[in-house]
């Protein structure tokens, strides 16, 4: 009986996660590294998909914005944990205490292994850099 209950729970969790991804907003088209941080972040905020206040600002001025509660964003089929960006002299972004990473930079942090993410990004023809963050957490980043 316990085995059947575990299977049912696993099935329910799997179906729930698939349902969430079915209603996800894909944003990989904007990760072509030809935009600015403002052009990447502002439409997501105006659509009500992304928080307007960063959850964190790094010393290098990279701002981390969470998707709003109930919103699911994806990039190359991977669920987006956070959108990261900075653009100099733009009121959407708060400066950090150190030297800014660039005049404009943007990207996402996704739930996925770096090798799998890098493969999908390359296959899509994007110029984005892929960076390992932690096990199964990967950054996709553009500095146009």
What is the predicted function of each stretch?
Residues 25-33, 108-109, 138-144:
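Short, extreme N-terminal segment that most often corresponds to the first beta-strand
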Residues 55-61, 97-104, 129-137:
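Short, ordered beta-strand-loop transition motifs
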